Curated annotation (Swiss-Prot):
<dbReference type="InterPro" id="IPR004391">
    <property type="entry name" value="Glu_race"/>
</dbReference>
<keyword id="KW-0961">Cell wall biogenesis/degradation</keyword>
<keyword id="KW-0413">Isomerase</keyword>
<dbReference type="GO" id="GO:0008881">
    <property type="term" value="F:glutamate racemase activity"/>
</dbReference>
<dbReference type="InterPro" id="IPR033134">
    <property type="entry name" value="Asp/Glu_racemase_AS_2"/>
</dbReference>
<keyword id="KW-0133">Cell shape</keyword>
<comment type="pathway">
    <text>Cell wall biogenesis; peptidoglycan biosynthesis.</text>
</comment>
<comment type="function">
    <text>Provides the (R)-glutamate required for cell wall biosynthesis.</text>
</comment>
<dbReference type="Pfam" id="PF01177">
    <property type="entry name" value="Asp_Glu_race"/>
</dbReference>
<dbReference type="InterPro" id="IPR015942">
    <property type="entry name" value="Asp/Glu/hydantoin_racemase"/>
</dbReference>
<feature type="binding site">
    <location>
        <begin position="42"/>
        <end position="43"/>
    </location>
    <ligand>
        <name>substrate</name>
    </ligand>
</feature>
<feature type="active site" description="Proton donor/acceptor">
    <location>
        <position position="185"/>
    </location>
</feature>
<dbReference type="InterPro" id="IPR018187">
    <property type="entry name" value="Asp/Glu_racemase_AS_1"/>
</dbReference>
<dbReference type="InterPro" id="IPR001920">
    <property type="entry name" value="Asp/Glu_race"/>
</dbReference>
<feature type="binding site">
    <location>
        <begin position="186"/>
        <end position="187"/>
    </location>
    <ligand>
        <name>substrate</name>
    </ligand>
</feature>
<feature type="binding site">
    <location>
        <begin position="10"/>
        <end position="11"/>
    </location>
    <ligand>
        <name>substrate</name>
    </ligand>
</feature>
<feature type="active site" description="Proton donor/acceptor">
    <location>
        <position position="74"/>
    </location>
</feature>
């Protein structure tokens, strides 16, 4: 049980930002990552569709890889599916919204926080509710940025056009008094440098990856599930879409070749 992998799922490549942080904080753990790049983005999809897709990814990992913990490294899927999946499976399941909210609360000085995310994440008010539950005196600015996920998935995030698309997407927040900005989509940290340049050094840019990895570590430790094996960890990367495109983005993000990327098909009927 201890050597069973942690499953990390996302609509595409964005959850790699969370997986990378889990690998850094928990270097002995085996990680299996599934990016549903064929059906990305989840942001504009109907909620029932997002729920079904998230369950398909979850069931695939439970049945084929016997994961000991699941990380829903997608804000849209967290907002829509986390509660349902937590109630239904027999392993620990964490999302990325609560950790992101906690991280922002720690660093804001003026209690004015911005949140950017997909249409579904923003529409759900999940971040605003999480933030106000922690501090009801906060002022929260929400902004949907639907252009950013397709841009990251295209693999062009190292291009100079990143600054232009960030400016186009974030300009409504530019003249606000926010001192902290939550990247409410796990794709967005890949554009963190461009976002920081546009918003200015006075704005704290919050990615949920670090806090999510810390929560994973805490839960595994509490439940006695930390991997103690001296054997080097085995990390697997799976995608439902174009394997070469996924591998290129993963290699760029990790700064080295991640190894073999497997293309999978999710044809099994939903099981809940």
């Amino acid at each position: 049980m201890l050597e069973q992998p942690i499953g990390v799922i996302d609509s595409g490549v964005g959850g790699l930002t969370v997986a990378k942080e889990i690998m850094r904080q928990l270097p002995k753990e085996n990680i299996i990552y599934v990016g549903d790049t064929k059906r990305c983005p989840y942001g504009p999809r109907p909620e029932e569709e997002v729920l079904q897709y998230t369950w398909e990814l979850t069931n695939y990992l439970l049945e084929n890889h016997h994961i000991k913990m699941l990380v829903i490294a997608c804000n849209t899927a967290t907002a829509i599916a986390l509660d349902d999946i937590q109630r239904s499976v027999g392993i620990p399941v964490v999302g990325v919204i609560q950790p992101g909210a906690r991280a922002a609360i720690k660093v804001t000085d003026n209690q004015h926080i911005g949140v950017i995310g997909t249409e579904n994440t923003i529409k759900s008010n999940a971040y605003e509710e999480a933030l106000l539950a922690l501090n009801p005196d906060l002022k929260v600015e929400n902004l949907a940025c639907p252009l950013l996920v397709p841009f990251v998935e295209s693999g062009k995030f190292l291009d100079k056009t990143a600054d232009e698309i960030v400016k186009t997407s974030l300009y409504p927040l530019k003249d606000t008094s926010i001192d902290s900005l939550i990247l409410g989509c796990t794709h967005y940290p890949i554009l963190k440098e461009a976002i920081q340049r546009y918003m200015g050094e006075h704005v704290n840019i919050i990615s949920s990856g670090d806090e999510t990895a810390r929560e994973v570590s805490t839960i595994l430790s509490y439940k006695g599930l930390l991997n103690q094996s001296p054997i080097a960890p085995d990390h697997q990367f799976l995608t439902t879409g174009a394997r070469d495109q996924f591998a290129k983005i993963a290699d760029d993000w990790f700064g080295h070749e991640v190894g073999h990327v497997e293309c999978i098909s999710l044809q099994e009927p939903i099981k809940r």
